[in-house]
Amino acid sequence: MKLTCALIITVLFLSITADDSRGKQGYRALKSIAGMLNSKTVRECREQSQGCTNTSPPCCSGLRCSGQSQGGVCISN
């Protein structure tokens, strides 16, 4: 009888704690990857001395991309 009661209490405790943790800790790696991707797309233009290519965001105003074909750099006009 004591074992049955202890088992029921344990199952109830585990079911209560399982509901509390739901959705708080899932897929941390995916969240961090999504955060990194979003941080790269927020930037609208490349600053001076940053790399630039045909597919990257354009250089900021007053700058131009020098040497795009070989992995260019944003420099002053």
Swiss-Prot record:
Signal peptide residues on this chain, from the entry's feature table: 1-19
GO cellular component terms listed in the entry, alphabetical order: extracellular region
InterPro entries, per the entry: Conotoxin
S-S pairs: 45-60, 52-65, 59-74
Any Pfam family hit: Conotoxin
Keyword Signal: yes
Cell location: Secreted
Residue stretch(es) of the prosequence: 20-43
Keyword NADP: no
Protein name: Conotoxin CaHr91
